[in-house]
Design a protein with these regions (language model features):
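Hydrophobic alpha-helical segments and their helix-loop junctions in multi-pass secondary transporters
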Residues: 3-24, 38-41, 105-128, 195-202, ...
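Hydrophobic, membrane-embedded alpha-helices of multi-pass small-molecule transporters
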Residues: 4, 41, 45-55, 62-87, ...
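Lipid-exposed faces of alpha-helical membrane segments in multi-pass integral membrane proteins
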Residues: 73-84, 100-106, 110, 183-190, ...
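Alpha-helical transmembrane segments
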Residues: 315-328, 353-359, 379-405, 488
Length: 493
């Protein structure tokens, strides 16, 4: 429902990537053409393009605003592409997946070669591979890690089950599960190296640019010798100037920024900000920036479409397999209705407050529910269906007995780990207290923290409840119907 809006944003940035210069590389002029836009100057050109030109974001969640027609058209295009890819079911989806899965690797290899040659790339890689052991005690870190692996492997979404339903009975699912897991882990590390090499370049560029501005300001103000100030003696010189010329230093002090490479590396942006702010910040400073921008957002679009094919397959497979629905509607009509309904609901995320609603769905619709779904699946297979029956089925499929390792992991380790993550999630929720969100303040040119309004908290509660209660409610309904049928079938004395 909400994931395809990322593809809409990718389309928007891809279309603007052919402009020279890139529209997020410079701030626009103000209304009087006497200077740059005030909001852009206080923030940055990349933040301004994201929050103002792309989202046209409202100051708070309470101010929904209207639907923005440009993102809405991009969202419509994104759903049209998804519909064309799933039009003929797995026959067309399979061919598209080969392209959407392989092309990003080519782009990542190109970006890896370019990223490792950028100035400051090693700073990003050192930051990536430097462990922070204190984070192991943070429950949210474990929950985020589990959510990420669920998303990347598609666990709990139903897409794997939907695709697996088309396999031959003799398919060696054990071998494929191992291969997919290894490829996923390799891809995550590979993509992280690419990301942090670019991130290191961006942080180093901003750090050195900050040093140049501060050095120029101090050199001009105190008539210092050109080239006297360096990164190694800057703090020492600042201390001397503050003590020797206190009144003069106090005048320029508000304009002296604290330049630190560590702080630049620590100001990590998550989620959509990483894709549409951090990367664009780095791309705009590269040579032939239009080329790198087109490659990046085309890769992002391919990854997004590939993910959407799996998500829609999880919805369409049970609908098309249902005799009641498929007897009245052809497969193309079912696919079209699913895309149309989701596109209509997704228009909420193209409003001025749409990004706030997107964050709500992203944070609360598929976190706790994923843990519960995977836990129920594990318990259902191991303890309801029976581990021995499941082992017998796998032996019939693969021709080999299942190792003790897998049985221990399925029946013992996996449920315990999932329950632990469930406890971590609840403890983090309790420790967080009042739920808050990040809102864009145009007057300051930065994000500010605000409390969720009451109706937003109600929506969050509804999302969590609806996504977690579907399994027990359906189980209860099935149980009641089963007993009603047994009662009707009983002989009358």
């Amino acid at each position: 429902m909400y994931y395809n809006v990322i593809n809409a944003w990718a389309f928007w940035y891809l279309f603007h990537s052919f402009q020279d210069p890139l529209p997020w590389s410079v701030c626009p002029l103000n209304g009087n053409h006497t200077g740059y836009d005030e909001e852009c100057e206080k923030a940055s050109s990349t933040q301004y393009f994201w929050y103002r030109k792309t989202l046209n974001i409202s100051p708070s969640l309470q101010e929904n605003g209207g639907v923005q027609w440009e993102p809405a058209l991009c969202l419509l295009l994104a759903w049209l592409v998804v519909y064309l890819c799933i039009l003929r079911g797995t026959e067309s989806t399979g061919k598209v997946v080969y392209f959407t899965a392989s092309l990003p690797y080519c782009v990542l290899i190109i970006y890896l070669i370019r990223g490792l040659t950028l100035h400051g790339a090693t700073n990003g890689l050192m930051y990536m591979f430097t462990p922070k052991m204190e984070q192991l005690a943070n429950p949210k870190a474990w929950v985020n890690a589990a959510t990420q692996i669920f998303f990347s492997l598609g666990l709990g979404f139903g897409s794997l089950i939907a695709f697996a339903s088309y396999n031959e009975p003799s398919n060696n699912c054990q071998k494929h599960a191992i291969i997919v897991s290894l490829i996923n882990s390799f891809t995550s590390i590979f993509a992280s190296i690419v990301t942090f090499s670019i991130y290191g370049f961006k942080a180093t560029f901003n750090y050195e640019n900050c040093l140049k501005k501060v050095s120029l300001l101090l050199t001009n103000t105190f008539d210092l010798e050109d080239g006297f100030l360096t990164a190694s003696n800057l703090e020492q010189v600042k201390g001397y100037l503050a003590s020797a010329y206190p009144s003069k230093y106090s005048e320029v002090f508000p304009h002296i920024k604290n330049c630190s490479l560590e702080s630049e590396l620590d100001t990590a942006v998550q989620g959509t900000g990483l894709a549409f702010i951090v990367y664009t910040e780095a791309i705009k400073n590269m040579e032939v920036s239009q080329l790198w921008s087109v490659l990046y957002f085309f890769m992002l679009l391919m990854l997004g479409i590939g993910s959407m094919l799996g998500n829609t397959a999880a919805i369409l497979t049970p609908l098309t397999d249902s005799k009641i629905i498929s007897s009245h509607l052809p497969k193309e009509a079912i696919s079209g209705l699913v895309c149309l309904v989701n596109c209509a609901i997704g228009m909420v995320f193209t409003m001025e407050a749409g990004n706030y609603w997107f964050d709500i769905f992203n944070d609360y619709a598929a976190t706790l529910s994923l843990l519960l779904i995977v836990l129920v699946e594990t318990i259902a297979v191991c303890y309801v269906y029976g581990l021995r029956r499941f082992e017998s089925d796998l032996k019939a499929m693969t021709g080999r007995a299942v190792s003790w390792y897998w049985k221990v992991m399925w029946a013992g380790v996996s449920p315990l780990l999932i329950v632990s993550l469930f406890v971590f999630y609840l403890s983090d929720y309790i420790l967080t207290g009042t739920l808050k969100y990040q809102a864009w303040d145009a007057s300051q040119g930065q994000l500010v923290t605000k409390d969720y309004p009451a109706y937003a908290l109600a929506v969050i509660g509804l999302l969590v409840a609806s996504s977690t209660m579907c399994i027990p409610l359906v189980a209860l309904g099935t149980f009641v119907l089963h007993h009603l049928k047994r009662g009707d079938a009983a002989p009358v004395a």
